[in-house]
């Protein structure tokens, strides 16, 4: 392999990126600068610098991207109502473009020759990282070890690490592939690869209680939204990061947001994962219910179509594209009236709407009541039905004529 002077490595401290440091030095005879994008993984950052240096990196950047992640990536996606294949709240998908953008910025500042990532050649993340890099530096060399090295499995990785004294905290029995940020925690691999196996929730879950261990009494919370963004919890104003942290704690306690899913990957195969998204699931439910109160029918129905496309774009690594940006502008316009307060009941994995109000509510009890009212003339419906049903009547009469042989 050609010698490189300096390589920027997207570094998490996990198994993949830990062994990539010595592999890069052995194969490219280069300086390795590790970059960790802090998107809210918290305790996973402990001891990371010491580990990176000990493994062979010349330095480690720990970039605090959490605020930008929540405000510029998570909240706009909530506003879009984007859910991939009806289940996945895109926890890994929208983190990768942000990290990729920052990798390019550091690579330029350091005068690096290449950017390296530890994504498997079977996964979606290789696409997400590399499209982000190409969006900001189309000429940057990208190294993807999983596509070129002789290591073929997680077991091979562990053996490689042990042979080079790379410090790792996992073992062969609990070697789930995980991804964690302030939004979610994903679990893949091992027994989860067989869809007939029930997940061992008591062993897997880290952010959440299992249903069985959730409290036997419900928890009530109140969320306040302004223009589609949650701004307060139980009447207390909070910044976006703090609010999401608090919802993660409350939701996790009540077993909210645990998803076992078989999804269609961008690269063609199906994969299975268990996702923990406690706070995010609460926000999606609250936001969607408030939209039901505040959006008119045509906007709401059209936005459902946009939500599906937006989810595909994010999942497929197309965050930095004209279409995603254009859709975000449309969505932003729809959120101008999504302001109000919603009370939620959380109980053993369930979220129940317990009442909501909005100054922009389009719900009129005066019109909708089953009781007596003075504003709606029910006789008006007759003319409406006559005109609305006219195509049906014309078609029915045409078939009647054909049957009679008179047409």
Swiss-Prot record:
It is found in: Cytoplasm. Pathway: Amino-acid biosynthesis; L-arginine biosynthesis; L-arginine from L-ornithine and carbamoyl phosphate: step 2/3. It catalyses: L-citrulline + L-aspartate + ATP = 2-(N(omega)-L-arginino)succinate + AMP + diphosphate + H(+). It is an enzyme of class 6 (ligase). One of its GO terms (biological process) is urea cycle. One of its GO terms (molecular function) is argininosuccinate synthase activity. Pfam families: Arginosuc_syn_C, Arginosuc_synth. L-citrulline binds at residues 88, 93, 124, 128, 177, 186, 263, 275. Its EC number is 6.3.4.5. CDD domains: ASS (cd01999). One of its GO terms (cellular component) is cytoplasm. It comes from the Bacteria. L-aspartate binds at residues 120, 124-125. Its main location: cytoplasm. ATP binds at residues 10-18, 118. Keywords: Amino-acid biosynthesis, Arginine biosynthesis, ATP-binding, Cytoplasm, Ligase, Nucleotide-binding. Homotetramer. HAMAP family: Arg_succ_synth_type1. Belongs to the argininosuccinate synthase family. Type 1 subfamily. This is Argininosuccinate synthase.
């Amino acid at each position: 392999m050609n010698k490189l002077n300096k390589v920027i490595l997207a570094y998490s401290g996990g198994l993949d990126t830990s062994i990539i440091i010595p592999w890069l030095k052995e194969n490219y005879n280069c300086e390795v600068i590790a970059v960790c994008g802090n998107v809210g993984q918290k305790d996973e950052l402990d001891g990371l610098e010491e580990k990176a240096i000990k493994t062979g990196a010349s330095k480690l950047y720990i970039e605090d991207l959490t605020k930008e992640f929540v405000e510029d990536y998570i909240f706009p996606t909530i506003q879009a109502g984007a859910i991939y294949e009806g289940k996945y709240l895109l926890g890994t998908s929208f983190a990768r473009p942000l990290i990729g953008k920052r990798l390019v910025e550091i690579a330029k500042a350091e005068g690096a020759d290449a950017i390296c990532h530890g994504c498997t050649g079977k996964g979606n993340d290789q696409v997400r990282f590399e499209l982000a890099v190409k969006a900001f530096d189309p000429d940057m060399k990208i190294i993807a070890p999983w596509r070129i090295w002789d290591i073929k499995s997680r077991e091979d990785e562990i053996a490689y690490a042990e042979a080079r004294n790379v410090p790792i905290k996992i073992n062969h029995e609990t070697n789930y592939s995980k991804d964690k940020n302030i939004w979610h925690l994903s679990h893949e691999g091992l027994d989860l690869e067989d869809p007939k196996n029930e997940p061992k929730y008591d062993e897997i879950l880290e952010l959440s209680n299992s249903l069985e261990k959730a409290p036997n009494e419900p928890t009530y919370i109140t969320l306040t939204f302004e223009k589609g963004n949650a701004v307060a919890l139980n009447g207390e104003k909070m910044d976006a990061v703090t609010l999401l942290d608090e919802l993660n704690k409350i939701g996790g306690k009540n077993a909210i947001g645990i998803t076992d899913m078989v999804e269609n990957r961008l690269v063609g195969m199906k994969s299975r994962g268990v996702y923990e998204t406690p706070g995010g699931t609460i926000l999606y439910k609250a936001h969607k219910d408030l939209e039901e109160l505040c959006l008119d029918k045509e906007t709401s129905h059209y936005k459902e179509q946009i939500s599906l496309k937006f989810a595909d774009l994010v999942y497929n690594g197309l965050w930095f594209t004209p279409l995603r940006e254009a859709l975000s502008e449309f969505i932003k316009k729809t959120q101008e009236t999504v302001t109000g307060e919603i009370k939620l009941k959380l109980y053993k994995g369930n979220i129940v709407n317990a009442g909501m109000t909005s100054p922009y509510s389009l719900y009129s009890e005066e019109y909708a009541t089953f009781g007596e009212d003075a504003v709606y003339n029910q006789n008006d419906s007759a003319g409406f039905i006559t005109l609305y049903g006219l195509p049906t009547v014309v078609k029915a009469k045409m078939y009647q004529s054909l049957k009679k042989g008179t047409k």
